[in-house]
């Protein structure tokens, strides 16, 4: 599965022996490891560094060693936007990739438009650790006309959606669980030494746990996660859709909660804005404001791969 995914990534990103990546992501993160595997298996090279994108040394190394490819998660790209993406002088970079979460379309559009002027190809991607990192990609030429799409399956992979009864959904814009098949799917999880005797449990098929739909051109869109829901007064609310509502209003957000309580964390310092957001969300999802708690924070707790640490949110109420 590691070899298969490395080859597929190398193919759609056109990685050659002339390419050089930099360790912008942790090795123990599947996306970060896939960057290393795909470049080395193609005869390319890797620049090793412990510096982050917020450090001057990181960008110095990119130019010093003529790095051609840069990978990041949404948090990394939010940092790049804060630094001023239009001011970045990185002439050797030919392609930049993003996975590991969802960026708002406004941010993706700003990034892709700016990078296009610098002759840098920007790829938005989707993946799962259980599929050795990457499942689909959205080519740069489709970024602006397929807003929010995760694209199509990587080479040698296949995507489809099923309803809750496991039946194939073949109608456009109908939501179901996203299913993937390919040689890059792992065998399963070994929680004990005895599990190693079970063999290939997944048999090349991965139920992602994400809800998705596809359009008339066969491009897929994530609509939420099967386990990212809370029940508020009997209504099933998608936490991902709540985050999407606030992101589209221009604010970074993280949503969690429990039965009859929706907890939303937003990066801002305006109490009036908190009340306005609570009112807007209440109107959009049809839930009484008393069930909505909005917490203004300066930053989100994050895991070492840059993703939001949802378990840590309750510690900053």
Tell me the role of every PLM-derived stretch.
Residues 148-153, 202-204:
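Short Gly/Pro-enriched turn/cap motifs at secondary-structure boundaries
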Residues 182, 187-188, 209-290, 299:
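AMP-binding/adenylate-forming catalytic core of the ANL superfamily
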Residues 75-77, 103, 185:
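Alpha-helix capping/helix-boundary segments
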Residues 67-72, 81-146, 158:
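Gly/Ser/Thr-rich phosphate-binding loop
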Residues 152-156, 167-199, 237:
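Conserved ATP/PPi-binding loop(s) of AMP-dependent carboxylate-activating enzymes
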């Amino acid at each position: 599965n590691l070899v298969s995914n490395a080859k597929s990534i190398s193919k759609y990103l056109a990685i050659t022996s002339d390419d050089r990546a930099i360790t912008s992501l942790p090795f123990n993160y599947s996306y970060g490891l896939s960057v290393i595997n795909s470049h080395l298996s193609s005869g390319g090279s890797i620049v090793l560094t412990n510096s982050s994108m917020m450090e001057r040394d990181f960008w110095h190394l990119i130019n010093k060693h003529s790095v051609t490819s840069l990978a990041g998660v949404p948090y990394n790209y939010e940092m790049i936007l804060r630094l001023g993406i239009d001011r970045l002088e990185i002439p050797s970079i030919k392609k930049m990739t993003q996975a590991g979460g969802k960026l708002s379309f406004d941010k993706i559009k700003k990034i892709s438009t700016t990078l296009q002027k610098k002759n840098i190809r920007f790829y938005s991607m989707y993946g799962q650790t259980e599929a050795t990192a990457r499942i689909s990609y959205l080519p740069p030429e489709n970024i602006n006309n397929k807003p929010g799409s995760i694209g199509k399956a990587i080479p040698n992979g296949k995507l489809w959606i099923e309803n809750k009864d496991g039946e194939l959904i073949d109608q456009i814009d109908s939501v179901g669980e996203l299913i993937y098949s390919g040689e890059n799917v792992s065998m399963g999880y070994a929680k004990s030494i005895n599990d190693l005797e079970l063999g290939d449990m997944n048999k090349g098929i991965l139920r992602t746990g994400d809800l998705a739909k596809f359009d008339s051109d066969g491009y897929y869109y994530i609509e939420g996660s099967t386990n990212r829901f809370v029940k508020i007064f009997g209504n099933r609310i998608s936490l991902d859709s709540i985050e999407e509502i606030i992101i589209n209003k221009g604010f970074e957000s993280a949503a969690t909660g429990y039965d009859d309580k929706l907890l939303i964390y937003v990066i801002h310092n305006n109490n009036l804005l908190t009340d306005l957001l609570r009112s807007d969300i209440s109107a959009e999802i049809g839930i009484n404001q008393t069930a909505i708690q909005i917490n203004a924070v300066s930053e989100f707790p994050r895991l070492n791969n840059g993703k939001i640490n949802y378990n840590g949110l309750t510690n900053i109420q």
